[in-house]
Design a protein with these regions (language model features):
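Structural microenvironment flanking redox-active thiols in thiol-disulfide oxidoreductases
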Residues: 71-111, 122-127
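N-proximal helix/coil linker or "cap" segments that precede and/or mark the start of modular domains
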Residues: 3-6, 10-38
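A short beta-strand-turn-helix
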Residues: 30-33, 39-59
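Thiol-/selenol-based redox modules, centered on thioredoxin-like
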Residues: 138-177
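Short active-site neighborhood of thiol/selenol oxidoreductases, capturing the structured segment around
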Residues: 51-73
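Structural micro-motif
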Residues: 113-115, 133-143
Length: 177
């Protein structure tokens, strides 16, 4: 086997391993129709917030990488901009990252955010939702949870500038049925 063939075999092996790893990670996402995994985490004001508190409401549970970064700020601003539309649809927004409550408080103050941001510093909830990146941050994924606590829609790798509108459209469509 010549050097070119060896390099080619190694390259293909690495590609296949990477693909298999990414598929395994994607398989860890809770699926549509599943009961949403339990969430109890501290928010920016230090209070404990539990997903079960919101039974009877729609929940937009969105995971994002880091406070005060460009994409995360755009996404948060858009959710804040549309907050009254979500409230009109009996929906709450909960953001989750691995940042601390202090970081969330600073982010909310600087950006004028009034919805809850939850601090998963131990990365347990982020991992349970299949949203822990290999760099230790939350991946940009969102779960729409119905009033009975079931996951009805999942978005992965979202575009921050368009995402709130996508979620609102899906929520409107689901509420028609």
């Amino acid at each position: 086997m010549n050097l070119y063939s060896v390099a080619r075999v190694i390259s293909l092996s690495v590609l296949c391993a990477g693909f298999a790893f990414s598929q395994a990670a994607a398989g860890d996402l809770p699926q549509v129709g599943q009961e949403a995994p339990a969430v109890t985490l501290p928010s920016q004001d230090g209070s404990q917030v539990s997903l079960k508190e919101f039974r009877g409401k729609w929940v937009v549970l969105y995971f994002y990488p880091k406070d005060n970064t460009p994409g995360c700020t755009i996404e948060a601003h858009n959710f804040q901009r549309d907050l009254s539309k979500y409230q009109d649809k009996n929906a709450v927004i909960l953001g989750v990252s691995v940042d601390s409550t202090e970081s969330h408080q600073d982010f909310c103050t600087k950006q004028g955010l009034t919805f809850k941001l939850l601090a998963d510093t131990e990365k347990k909830v982020v991992a349970e939702y299949g949203s822990l990146s290999d760099r230790g941050f939350a991946s940009r994924n969102t779960f729409l949870i119905d009033p009975e606590g079931k996951i009805v829609k999942v978005w992965t790798g979202v575009k921050p500038s368009e995402h709130s509108e996508e979620v609102l459209a899906a929520l409107s469509e689901l509420q028609k049925n």
